Amino acid sequence: DECANAAAQCSITLCNLYCGPLIEICELTVMQNCEPPFS
């Protein structure tokens, strides 16, 4: 789905757009799986 895709793309911006109430989970996924800086 688009929220999981946002996390896969390491994009906090896309997390905000697509994840709604799941934003915190999306952000955690990005921080755990991706190298900074996050977009």
From Swiss-Prot:
Subcellular location field: Secreted
Entry's Gene Ontology molecular function annotations: pheromone activity
Cellular component GO terms, alphabetical: extracellular region
Pfam families in the cross-refs: E_raikovi_mat
UniProtKB keywords: Disulfide bond, Pheromone, Secreted
Disulfide linkage: 3-19, 10-34, 15-26
Main location: secreted
UniProt xrefs under InterPro entries: Pheromone_protoz (IPR009064), Pheromone_protoz_sf (IPR036245)
Role of this protein: Mating ciliate pheromones (or gamones) are diffusible extracellular communication signals that distinguish different intraspecific classes of cells commonly referred to as 'mating types'. They prepare the latter for conjugation by changing their cell surface properties.
Subunit and partners: Homodimer.
Name the UniProt record assigns to this protein: Mating pheromone Er-11
Name of the gene encoding the protein in the UniProt record: MAT11
